[in-house]
């Protein structure tokens, strides 16, 4: 996107004009702003542009989108001509801190007769609270119809950490659920408990404004048990 075609000083003979193509490239990366996260990680992401040679729009787009995928990061880029390298351009990346946390909650009556129908859920995420560009998430859900003897309680915890300069993330999570179905199943005094452990690695293969293709590898471990009075 920085390539230029210029007409150098010359004598035109027989109607033939010589053109000179100057392939534009990134000569320097500058980071501005005081993000809450790991500035060294942000620079490693941005330095990928120095490895590309002639700058391609899709390479710049990929770097900026993966930067903005980092929890707590809002980044934009500005291009300017290099003062000492012909054909070179400096890329200034202006980084700001996004919200420290995000919270959402919901209350609906779309549960089942056995666990519901009223269901309350809430999620909270801390963005780079440890200044590592990490995401820490907590989620809860409950079916409060039975009040003290609730029909369902759920809790989840997860930690996601970017690794390397290419948008790869590693995530570990834990969730636990307690269930005591009501309605016609209440006579069987069913009580269940389940614990789930998750390890997940994810990498963006294609990252553009219009396309997002990721590959992931996930390991799950489930431990569950149930008690009842069914003979």
Each model region followed by its residue ranges:
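Transmembrane beta-strand segments of outer-membrane beta-barrel domains in Gram-negative
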Residues: 102, 162, 167-231
